[in-house]
């Protein structure tokens, strides 16, 4: 995995964890959890691609991996919409920068997962 992506994930998660958005902090915690889950999924998919022979064990271990892949894309789309919404409503420049970076990272991760999945199919 690209070290810039790793540091981007870590930076975004750290910055988001420092934000306090009042009554919506539960929503923010949910977003942070989904970011962490997405990072783990992307990492495991990338490792499977690197080991190319691992596609068979991936399919055997989880016969519904394509369904899981579809769910991850839905999560990414939800996160993109949520981040866009937060970006529109916040007036704090620190939060705006964080959400803009999170949005860019989501687009990059979505593209990477698409690339990995095409290599696995």
Swiss-Prot record:
A motif (Nuclear export signal) lies at residues 12-21, 85-94. Its main location: virion. It comes from the Viruses. Keywords: Host nucleus, Host-virus interaction, Transport, Virion. It is found in: Virion; Host nucleus. It holds the Pfam family Flu_NS2. InterPro entries: Flu_NS2. GO terms for biological process: exit of virus from host cell nucleus through nuclear pore. GO terms for cellular component: host cell nucleus; virion component. The keyword Nucleus does not apply. Belongs to the influenza viruses NEP family. Mediates the nuclear export of encapsidated genomic RNAs (ribonucleoproteins, RNPs). Acts as an adapter between viral RNPs complexes and the nuclear export machinery of the cell. Possesses no intrinsic RNA-binding activity, but includes a C-terminal M1-binding domain. This domain is believed to allow recognition of RNPs bound to the protein M1. Interacts with protein M1. May interact with host nucleoporin RAB/HRB and exportin XPO1/CRM1. This is Nuclear export protein. The gene is NS.
């Amino acid at each position: 995995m690209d070290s810039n992506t790793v540091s981007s994930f870590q930076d975004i998660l750290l910055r988001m964890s420092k934000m306090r958005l009042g009554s919506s902090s539960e929503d923010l915690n949910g977003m942070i959890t989904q970011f962490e889950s997405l990072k783990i999924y992307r990492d495991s998919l990338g490792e499977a691609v690197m080991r190319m022979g691992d596609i068979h064990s991936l399919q055997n271990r989880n016969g519904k991996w394509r369904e899981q892949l579809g769910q991850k894309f839905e999560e990414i789309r939800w996160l993109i919409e949520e981040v866009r919404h937060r970006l529109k409503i916040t007036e704090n420049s620190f939060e705006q920068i964080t959400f803009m970076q999170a949005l860019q990272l989501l687009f990059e991760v979505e593209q990477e997962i698409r690339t990995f999945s095409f290599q696995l199919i």
